[in-house]
């Protein structure tokens, strides 16, 4: 597990992309439990190198949107799984670290499992690609691959995908649930800014985001 030496290296334009956000686990029966849970996210084992332009855009917004908008409006109880796709097809960082070439994951996934009013569990999957951004900024050495799965994600965007595709790419078995999205095509998500009611104070319990995500199926 690499730490500061990766994020301070020459040509490193990475954020420490938290897989699990502090806010997601900051809860518990006591304040101490909640604080310990929040602090548990500040380890390098919970961070992956993500290009700043992607980490701070729709990928970061996706979970906020689901938690604060969809969850609130539909009274959903959700559980989020997330991580990088680790593969021999991942490209090499242009700068050796400690004299070694380091592969950088360029695909990241997120699965949201939630319960609807019918009491049944549903799940949706998302995939994000940073390969194009890394290439354009000369951060990685281009690694050619004929892997058709990886080649589905050429743009630096976030897509809604079948959970089965995430399972195929990661080798993981996601908890079984009803798939809300069954299209075989990967659908690009679009972040659209909206106007926030100026009368709504920032400390209001009626938390409101300044954007919506179009093309999202839950």
Question: How should these model regions be labeled?
Answer:
Residues 56-63, 175-179:
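Acidic/polar loop patches that form or flank catalytic/metal-binding clefts of enzymes
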Residues 25-33, 60-65, 90-95, 125:
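A short secondary-structure junction signal
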Residues 38-39, 68, 98-101:
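A generic local secondary-structure boundary/capping motif
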Residues 72-218:
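C-terminal, well-folded lobe of enzymatic/effector domains
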Residues 1-59:
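Betabetaalpha-Me/HNH-type nuclease active-site subdomain
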Residues 65-71:
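Short, glycine/acidic-rich hinge or "gate" loops at secondary-structure transitions
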Residues 46, 61, 158-161:
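Generic recognition of stable, solvent-exposed alpha-helical segments in well-folded globular domains
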Residues 19-24, 47, 56, 64-65, ...:
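An acidic- and aromatic-residue-enriched active-site/binding cleft used to recognize and process polar
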């Amino acid at each position: 597990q690499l730490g500061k030496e990766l994020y301070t290296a020459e040509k490193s334009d990475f954020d420490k992309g938290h897989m699990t956000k502090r806010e997601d686990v900051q809860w518990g029966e006591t304040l101490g439990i909640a604080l310990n849970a929040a602090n548990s996210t500040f380890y390098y084992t919970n961070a992956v190198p993500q290009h700043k332009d992607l980490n701070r855009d729709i990928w970061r917004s996706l979970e906020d949107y689901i938690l604060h908008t969809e969850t609130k409006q539909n009274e959903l109880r959700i559980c989020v799984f997330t991580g990088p796709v680790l593969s021999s097809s991942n490209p090499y960082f242009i700068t050796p670290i400690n004299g070694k070439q380091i592969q950088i994951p360029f695909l990241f996934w997120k699965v949201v499992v939630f319960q609807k009013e019918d009491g049944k569990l549903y799940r949706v999957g998302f995939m994000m690609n940073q390969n194009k951004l890394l290439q354009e900024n000369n951060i990685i050495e281009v690694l050619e691959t004929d892997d058709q799965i990886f080649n589905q994600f050429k743009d630096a965007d976030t897509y809604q995908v079948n959970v089965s595709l995430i399972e195929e790419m990661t080798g993981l078995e996601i908890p079984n649930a009803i798939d809300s999205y069954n299209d075989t095509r990967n659908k690009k998500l679009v972040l659209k800014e909206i106007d926030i009611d100026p009368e709504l104070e920032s400390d209001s319990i009626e938390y409101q985001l300044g954007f919506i995500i179009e093309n999202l199926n839950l």
